[in-house]
């Protein structure tokens, strides 16, 4: 008897879970069309301006993504060039440090 009651209660609960979300949806699609009157020209222009701004922002984001992915002067540690490329990168970094005024090497005395 307890099994049958539990089964019946679970079936009713399952049916309610299916019915409640379906009743929340509108019966007729409105498509954002107002039947009570004409649209104001200011509203239409405002909507078109917002749409234009969104399109411009999307284009800027696409260009920004392309600029980031195709960056030629990105930090390159030689990892993508193999072992010899990594050695060459270390050599070039050493040359750059040697050419730097405060870089490694023997400190020269000032000639006074």
Swiss-Prot record:
Proline amide PTM positions: 104
Entry comment describing in which tissues the protein is expressed: Expressed in corpora cardiaca (CC), corpora allata (CA), antennal lobe (AL) and gnathal ganglion (GNG) (at protein level). Expression in CC, CA and AL detected in most animals, expression in GNG in few animals (at protein level).
InterPro entries xref list: DH2-like
Compartments, as annotated in UniProt: Secreted
Propeptide residue interval(s): 25-71, 108-112
Signal peptide, first to last residue: 1-24
Family: Belongs to the diuretic hormone class 2 family.
UniProt lineage: Eukaryota, Metazoa, Ecdysozoa, Arthropoda, Hexapoda
GO CC, one annotated term: extracellular space
Membrane-spanning ranges: none
Biological processes, Gene Ontology terms: body fluid secretion; neuropeptide signaling pathway
Function per UniProt: Regulation of fluid secretion. Stimulates Malpighian tubule fluid secretion.
PANTHER family: DIURETIC HORMONE CLASS 2 (PTHR41146:SF1)
Keywords noted in UniProt: Amidation, Cleavage on pair of basic residues, Hormone, Neuropeptide, Secreted, Signal
Native source organism of the sequence: Agrotis ipsilon
Protein name: Diuretic hormone class 2
GO molecular function: diuretic hormone activity; G protein-coupled receptor binding
């Amino acid at each position: 008897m307890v099994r049958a009651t539990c089964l019946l209660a679970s079936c009713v609960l399952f049916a309610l879970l299916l019915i409640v979300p379906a009743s929340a949806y509108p019966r007729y699609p409105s498509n954002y069309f107002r039947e009570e009157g004409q649209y104001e020209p200011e509203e239409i222009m405002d909507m078109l301006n917002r749409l234009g701004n969104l399109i411009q922002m999307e284009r800027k984001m696409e260009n920004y993504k392309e600029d980031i992915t195709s960056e030629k002067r990105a930090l390159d540690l030689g990892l993508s060039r193999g072992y010899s490329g990594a050695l060459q990168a270390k050599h070039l970094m050493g040359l750059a440090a040697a050419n730097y005024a405060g870089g490694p090497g023997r400190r020269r005395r000032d000639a006074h």
